[in-house]
Amino acid sequence: MTLLPSPKLKLKTDNQSLGDKTALRRKLIKQAGLEPLRVLDLFAGEGTIWGSLRQPARLKNAPEALNVESYTPIDSVARQPGQIRFKITPRLIAALDEGGGLSRYNCVDVDCFGDPFAIWQALLFRIRVPTAVFLTRGRVTYGAGRMPISKLAKKVMGIPEEWDVPGKVELMEYGDRCQLLQPCPTAKIAFGYKITLRRVDYYALLVKPTEAHATT
């Protein structure tokens, strides 16, 4: 599967680009035909992204509001009404999925500040219905030419955990790709889009379960 970046979405903006994020989500959701949406918003913050996507159009040529049937925001700090306050970890994803609970959602947003791939892995192996997954991958440099490489990235790339690997950009990008496209017997990425900016990547992915693991 090849991630296909859309030239129309490659906007030169900063890491906080609401326009990029909302355009990317609209494009995938409309193409996948997932409405009405049942949204699980991880790292929800003040709910700015989904507040914008649900807002009725005020201008003539503005896009229509997305049809959101339910919205569940979760973050470690309470910043909006109705939010669940909890630290976002793979253990939380497992708890949410007890009794097949993740099947209640057909849209999962992981708009974190750093590495989303531990959460991505926890989600991928539990998806039982066609689901839009949105990932924000931020990059922070620690020292000259170094960035942190997670234990999961090393594992997926086949690098021993104890090795002190130079955090070069090329290796980080390869590690991200390996984690994103890791083999999964229960679900696969049907198609996706990616926006690459200087310090952040935005991914929009439609994930479908295999026939044997789909929830009817």
What is the predicted function of each stretch?
Residues 40-42, 65-75, 108-110:
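Short, hydrophobic beta-strand segments that form beta-sheet elements in well-ordered domains
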Residues 1-61, 74-103, 107:
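S-adenosyl-L-methionine
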Residues 152-210:
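A conserved mid-domain beta-alpha-beta active-site/ligand-binding segment of alpha/beta enzyme cores
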Residues 37, 106, 131:
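Conserved acidic residues
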Residues 114-127:
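A short, conserved alpha-helix within the catalytic core of class I
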Residues 33, 127-128:
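A generic alpha-to-beta junction signature in SAM-dependent methyltransferases
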Residues 130-144:
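Conserved beta-strand signature within the Rossmann-like core of class I S-adenosyl-L-methionine
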